[in-house]
Amino acid sequence: MRRNFDPDDYALVVKLRADPPRPWRWEIYCAGKRLPIEHSEAFFETRGAANKAGKQALSQLIAKLSV
């Protein structure tokens, strides 16, 4: 595990960033950073779909950073 790594410093946010029919995207933020460190390339029809994909991306990021 990386030194000073805390998974609780990373948060998933789903935001309305475009016009319908696919307005939703997920973004991952790190504590202390103003801009997202990752975001979805694709937009989603529903907030729920973006949230589900974002949770998977956050899990993968945390797994990668914790090695």
Regions found by a protein language model. Give the residues of each.
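A broad, structure-centric signal for solvent-exposed, well-ordered loop/edge residues
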Residues: 21-23, 35, 51
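A short, exposed loop/beta-hairpin motif centered on an aromatic-Gly-Thr core
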Residues: 35-49
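Acidic helix/loop or adjacent segment enriched in Glu/Asp that either coordinates divalent metal
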Residues: 46, 50-58
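Short arginine-rich
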Residues: 56-67
